Structures are given as structure tokens and as C-alpha cells.
A protein has these predicted regions:
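A detector for small-residue-rich transmembrane helices and their helix-helix packing motifs
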Residues: 1-136
């Protein structure tokens, strides 16, 4: 599910921030989302994030320096993937009281958060696409 949230988040970022009538549905934004997810998990585990951050920075440098690569899709995927993973990991502890923090309740909160992020990503893409084509 994190993959799909990042995929749609990257596509929405392209539609919001790229000039012109650009569409994107490449998997690279989703892959960046998985890198963001790994970063969140590493930070939660209190392990040194140096390796993950290095990989992300190297890939972002490639995104900036190589022609025809959508930086907006990559950054959008990274942000939405990290946000989706943070929602799964941190939100249940924030929303649920200590007595109701069962695995089942935490799972429900995480899934609802993922669905909300997915709807936001798709909604942003639809709004951006509609305004780019003159429908809004």
C-alpha cells in the first residue's frame, strides 16, 4: 500500500509542480517512496540513517543532473512514501489511548491513514489535472 500511495503522490506532484500539461505514472516515484519508507523505519529503530540518506541523496543528484528525469515525481514519491510509513508506525500511538492499543486497533488506524493519504494523492492529481486542462 505504501508503494501505491507513493506512486500516486509522485504523479500528483508532477501534475502540481511541473510546467505545462505533463502526466506521469512511472514507478520511479514509488521507488523513491519506498526509500522514504526505509528512512522512517530506520529512524524509528534508532539506527544510524547515514546509509539510507546517502542513497537518497545520490539518487536525487541523478534526478537533478540527468535530462528527462522528473524531480517532482521523485520528491513527491519520497514525501508520500515517508508520510505513509510514518502514519503506519506513529499514528496508532498518537490516536489510540494506552488501554485500546491492541494490534488490531493499531492496524485499523494505520490502514485508515494509508487510505486517507491515497485519497489525498489522487485528489491532488485530479485537481491539478483538471486545472491544467482548463476544467476548473
Amino acid at each position: 500500500m505504501v508503494y501505491f500511495v507513493a506512486l500516486f503522490g509522485g504523479s500528483a506532484a508532477v501534475m502540481l509542480f511541473e510546467a505545462g500539461n505533463v502526466r506521469s505514472a512511472g514507478a520511479s516515484g514509488a521507488i523513491y517512496g519506498l526509500m522514504g519508507a526505509v528512512l522512517v523505519v530506520v529512524l524509528k529503530a534508532r539506527v544510524s540513517p547515514t546509509g539510507v540518506i546517502t542513497i537518497i541523496v545520490i539518487n536525487l543528484v541523478f534526478s537533478v543532473t540527468m535530462p528527462g528525469i522528473s524531480l517532482a515525481a521523485h520528491v513527491g514519491g519520497l514525501v508520500f512514501g515517508a508520510a505513509a510509513t510514518a502514519a503506519i508506525i506513529y499514528l496508532p500511538g498518537v490516536v489510540l489511548h494506552r488501554e485500546s492499543r491492541t494490534q488490531q486497533n493499531a492496524s485499523r488506524v494505520g490502514w485508515v491513514a494509508l487510505v486517507v493519504l491515497l485519497v489525498i494523492a489522487i485528489g491532488l492529481g485530479v485537481v491539478a489535472g483538471s486545472s491544467a486542462s482548463g476544467l476548473v
